[in-house]
Amino acid sequence: MKKIWYAPYKFESYGEAEIKAVEESLRDGWLAGFGPRTTEFEQKIAKEFGKKYGVFVNSGSSACLLAIASLDLEKGSEIITPSLTFSTTLAPIIQLGYVPKFIDSELTTYVPSVNAIIEAITSKTKAIMVPNLIGNKPDWELLRRELMRMNRSDIFVIEDSADTITSTEDSDISTTSFYASHVITAGGMGGMVMFNKKEHKKRALMFRDWGRIGDNSENMDDRFTHSVDGLPYDYKFLYGVLGYNMKCAEANAAFGLVQLERFQSFKNIRRANIERYLENLKDVKELILPDDSIKPNWLAIPLQTKNRLELLQFLEKNNIQTRVTFAGNVTRHPVYREYLQDFEVADTIMKNGFLLGAHHGMNTDDVDYVCDKIKEFYASK
């Protein structure tokens, strides 16, 4: 019996074209991610998101950290973020010394309303960090208009779009992920943070590349324009921030460029799978289906039911891989207990929510099989 995976498995999402591109990259002699393929990948992904600059990194989690670090906010600043989230959307807020201001989300969209965001704003609010969770989006355009109406254009809007690739010109900074389970992948890993302001990009590069002030120029006139205590010093080894090593390899960019060419076809398959799920399950009264009104590029099909564990056990026994809805109410997890709060929707989804595959490695027969098994489960009750 075929296994229905939550995410593309093995060769369901890549093939000879990606393998050839990686081989060509290696034969060209590029290893570190400073070559022409990385530059091209950064430019093309940034364009998809409506941003001017892209910085290729090793994961979406790293992209989220660099997004916040690039702003150089005052310690203790508040950053509004939803309780229904993924852990590494939240973690860098705390790691970098800022204060998360949690809000709830909406039951069938899985993202917060603009009203919820606006009502959480205080004089200490310096940024908003919201994920396009499972691929759905809040109304970023309305949020930007409301911030302008409030004369709070000082608040940075960060869009964590790890779960999907989309165009959101109304955010200041966007991040995305190329992890193996996502819409496209850069060889199983990778992420990108994207900016409109060059100074934010420059600061992100410093944090990505060990904290160094310099870039990859080999020009001696560039390299020795700085000094340390009066000593002219190579800015390739001059450090301005407490940095990291978050680079990806050139081969990852080569892989990602081929995937980007296939993005529209992947997206179309996912859309067809989502619509088939919704049609097949519309009469299953035990399920809460997602709000698909804006036709988002869903990462997976999010569902809710009151007897989740029993259903998931049944599906797994029938070779259907399942997932819960990420962190649910993240403040209930061990590492975040000091922020513990009740959130009606996040708590409900933590209790009842789950995800099933709708990816481009699946076909209509796969979706029908999953739906038939769900109906079989409820028919036995």
State each model region's role:
Residues 1-32, 240, 357:
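N-terminal "arm"/small-domain region of PLP-dependent enzymes with the aminotransferase-like
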Residues 11, 154, 166-167, 183-184, ...:
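Short secondary-structure boundary/capping segments
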Residues 31-78, 92-95, 102-104:
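Phosphate-binding glycine-rich loop
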Residues 36-44, 48-54, 115, 119, ...:
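PLP-dependent aminotransferase class I/II
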Residues 56, 81, 102, 193, ...:
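Conserved SAM-binding loop
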Residues 69-161, 165:
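PLP-dependent aminotransferase-like
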Residues 91-93, 183, 251:
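Hydrophobic/aromatic ligand-binding patch that stacks against planar heteroaromatic rings
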Residues 156-187, 192, 199-202, 235-238:
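Conserved active-site segment immediately N-terminal to the catalytic lysine
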